[in-house]
């Protein structure tokens, strides 16, 4: 922990609307999926579909037993919050499967790390186009309130679909800076749990990490916030993952960001 702004808050304090007070912080950096928009479950479902198709095909060829991708265990442990190709690598490593790296131009049919990642990307794009995106109401209210207080806001996401999701949810104009998978590739930034993308967003905003807040729902994300020595790391546990988020770097955990909204 660095600086006087980083504090461990108790449960009662964590629910106070002034947790994100203007005198303590200048900016709030939000993850996208599961924090701002209800797209985390869509990503998880697409990862499962893609990996299960690959694993089933592999099992048929090798004679190995087919063990499907588990959303509860595998998604949280190996994929959630990470850059797409990092997620592919980490999950395959957990199954002792080695594939060629390939390159980002690989077709979705290629049996490479990039090919599998591109296959998943095609799936999520199809879902976004057909079903649209809904933002979490409490999150939108909080972001608007923070901006009225003069605080800067950013989206920091591992997704290459970040801008499309923000536009579909009609919230793109609520953020001063966006650091996503596309930006990470261009700037050669390491993905979460490394703090690089959050640090890049804070730098673009002109705010030191100690004066910025990270808001995340993924284990890799809160780990990144802690590694970057940000002033406060807020975990969002919509499905009861509070203990895991606290154990991995969250200073406080809420079930929904509406808990941090000041009701005048």
Where are each of the predicted segments found?
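Short amphipathic alpha-helix with an adjacent loop that forms part of the alpha/beta core around
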Residues: 19-20, 259-264
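Short acidic-hydrophobic, aromatic-tinged amphipathic segments that line or gate anion-handling sites
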Residues: 252-256
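Conserved SAM-binding loop
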Residues: 36, 135, 155, 214-215, ...
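Short glycine-rich donor-binding/catalytic loop of glycosyltransferases
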Residues: 237-240, 257
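Substrate-recognition "cap/lid" segment bordering the active-site pocket of phosphatases
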Residues: 9-10, 133, 151-152, 160-213, ...
